[in-house]
Regions:
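Flavin (FAD/FMN)-binding glycine-rich loop and adjacent Rossmann-like elements that form
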Residues: 1-291
C-alpha cells in the first residue's frame, strides 16, 4: 500500500505531487494576514517552507471533515462551545473577515451554499467542503492518519470536531465578528434529532483518502482517461479528478518585506476527459501485483 501524493514522475501524471499555493478556483478574499500580532503564525496555517517543491512526492492527504447535519429549526442545538475553546485559535476567520470588508460570503459551508439533503418541512442541511479559507475542510489536521493506530485516529477526529464546532461558535458569538455575521450564523445550529448519542455530531469522520492498494494495475490520471473502457471492468466511476486542499500556507507577499498572506494548496477538479467524468474500474486494481 501507499499513502500521500506520488510524484509526477512516478506514473507520469501532470496533476500529481505537491503543488504551488495558488488562487485557482478559490473563493474569498485575498491578502489575508497569516500572522498574529506577536509575529507567530496563526493556528491552522503552515509555513510554506514545509511544502515540497511542485511535482514532488509528499505525505499530504486532502482535507477530512465531518459532514455535519445543521438546522435552522427552532429546536436546533445552539452552536456549542467546544471543550478547551480558545477564541484566538480562530483568528484566521477574523483575518478573513477583515480582508473581505466584514462579509462572510467566503465561508461556503452554510446556506445558501449548504447542500440541501433532507426532504420535508424541517430545515436541515448537510455541510460540505469549501475551496476557501473559511471552510469546514481543514487540511493538515489529518497528518499521520494513514499509519496511525485507533487511539491517534480518535485524537485526529477530536481535533476536527474542535475546529468545526469552534469555527461556528466563533462566528456566532465572538464580539470581534460583525453583528450581521453573528446574527446570520446564529440562525443555525446542530440538528436536535440527529446523532444525539454523539453530541449531535456524526461519529464518522469523512476520510476522503488514506492508504491505497498498489495492485497489479494502478488507476492513474492517464489510465482513467485513455482508454476509458477496460476489458476487465468491474464497475464504473463517475466523478472528476477532485482533490480537496491539503494545506493553508503562509506565503511571502511580493514587494512587502515580512508580510505573509494565507494561500491554499492542493485543490483541483478538472474533468476526466472531453468534459465528462465516467471511467471504467479494472478488476486488476484489486489483485496482488505480480512479480
Amino acid at each position: 500500500v501507499t499513502a500521500g501524493r506520488e510524484s509526477i514522475a512516478t506514473y507520469n501524471e501532470p496533476l500529481a505531487g505537491a503543488r504551488k499555493p495558488s488562487w485557482s478556483g478559490v473563493r474569498g478574499p485575498r491578502g489575508v494576514d497569516a500572522l498574529r500580532s506577536d509575529g507567530r503564525l496563526l493556528k491552522y496555517v503552515q509555513n510554506v517552507s514545509e511544502l515540497r517543491p511542485a511535482g514532488e512526492a509528499d505525505d499530504a492527504l486532502m482535507a477530512f471533515q465531518h459532514r455535519m447535519c445543521i438546522s435552522a429549526d427552532d429546536d436546533r442545538i445552539r452552536w456549542p462551545k467546544p471543550p478547551k475553546y480558545d477564541p484566538d485559535d480562530f483568528l484566521l476567520i477574523q483575518r478573513a473577515l477583515e480582508a473581505s470588508g466584514g462579509s462572510a460570503d467566503f465561508f461556503t459551508s452554510l446556506p445558501p451554499a449548504a447542500l440541501p439533503g433532507y426532504p420535508g418541512k424541517k430545515k436541515k442541511y448537510c455541510l460540505c467542503c469549501g475551496i476557501t479559507i473559511g471552510a469546514t475542510d481543514q487540511p493538515s489536521l489529518n497528518s499521520g492518519w494513514a499509519s496511525a493506530g485507533w487511539e491517534r485516529r480518535k485524537q485526529i477526529t477530536d481535533e476536527h470536531t474542535y475546529f468545526e464546532l469552534g469555527s461556528f461558535y466563533y462566528l456566532a458569538n465572538d464580539p470581534r465578528v460583525p453583528l450581521p455575521v453573528r446574527t446570520s450564523f446564529g440562525k443555525y445550529g446542530l440538528c436536535a434529532d440527529e446523532f444525539a448519542d454523539y453530541g449531535h455530531v456524526p461519529p464518522q469522520l469523512y476520510v476522503r483518502i488514506s492508504n491505497r492498494l498498489v495492485g497489479d494495475a494502478v488507476v492513474t490520471q492517464n489510465s482513467i482517461a485513455s482508454p476509458r473502457t477496460k476489458s476487465d471492468s468491474i464497475g464504473v466511476g463517475d466523478w472528476s479528478f477532485d482533490e480537496h486542499m491539503t494545506g493553508k500556507y503562509a506565503v511571502p507577499v511580493a514587494g512587502q518585506a515580512g508580510k505573509l498572506e494565507v494561500m491554499l494548496e492542493g485543490n483541483f477538479w478538472p474533468a476526466i476527459a472531453n468534459g465528462s467524468n465516467w471511467y471504467d474500474v479494472p478488476y486488476s486494481v484489486m489483485t496482488p501485483k505480480r512479480g
